[in-house]
């Protein structure tokens, strides 16, 4: 990951391989934003972009405007979702209006449009950005343990392929997520995940501070761990 300061206080992490063009591949505007660079205060400090929170809507609007501007888009072209830890991926169609007026229930957005950005929000969960740069299809997925176990990543790939992508051409970048040492879960998580994937038992460790709980390596690996920053951070392509 490479960090670019879009403004003096607005860092954006991005994958260098997508940020440059080549004779074979076009560059792709994308990024994983942090909790820094916004105007929210208190528990939402500072780049909170979640309309589902109790933050001041005017602050959320300004934070989202900054993210959109950092990617080169107007705020009404930054489309997000009402995420609910599902395996539902949806297509952003050509007929979609302003992003401010809609937040459909889903955990992944896919689009073939070149005039918009699709975004998901994470705190502890894993953001995954997808791109088929050969065929002009992109996706953004929110993968918590329920969504990942339920197939949100597979749903995103399937939706992309249904709209012109090919498996051989799809690339994915995994963004920052909670580290195992900070991710305490209960029996419900362990039982559900291990029932579906028996080999995943190795990724659960009894929490030494709470023996009735476990520490879990979300999605089995968390290559870019974060510690303790819980505002709703946007990831976009």
Model-identified regions with their sequence ranges:
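Active-site microenvironment for binding and transforming phosphate-containing groups
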Residues: 1-222
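Single conserved hydrophobic/aromatic residue that forms the stacking wall/gate
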Residues: 220-237
């Amino acid at each position: 990951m490479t960090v670019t300061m879009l403004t003096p206080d607005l860092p954006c992490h991005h994958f260098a391989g997508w940020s440059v063009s080549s004779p074979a591949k076009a560059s792709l505007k994308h990024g994983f934003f942090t909790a820094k660079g916004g105007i929210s205060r208190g528990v939402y400090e500072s780049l909170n972009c979640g309309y589902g929170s109790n933050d001041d809507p005017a602050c959320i609007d300004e934070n989202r405007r900054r993210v959109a501007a950092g990617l080169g888009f107007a705020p009404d072209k930054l489309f997000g979702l009402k995420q609910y830890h599902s395996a539902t991926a949806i297509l952003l169609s050509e007929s979609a209006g302003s992003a401010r007026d809609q937040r459909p229930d889903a955990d992944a957005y896919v689009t073939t449009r070149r005039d918009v950005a699709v975004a998901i929000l994470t705190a502890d969960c894993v953001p995954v950005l997808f791109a088929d740069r050969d065929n002009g299809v992109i996706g953004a997925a929110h993968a918590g343990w329920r969504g990942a176990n339920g197939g949100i990543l597979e749903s995103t790939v399937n939706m992309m392929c249904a709209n012109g992508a090919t498996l051989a051409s799809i690339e994915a970048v995994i963004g920052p997520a909670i580290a195992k040492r900070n991710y305490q879960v209960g029996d419900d998580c362990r039982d559900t995940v291990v029932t579906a994937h028996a080999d995943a038992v190795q990724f659960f460790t009894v929490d030494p501070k709470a023996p009735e709980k476990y520490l879990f390596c979300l999605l089995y690996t968390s290559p870019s761990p974060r510690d303790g920053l819980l505002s709703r951070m946007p990831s976009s392509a």
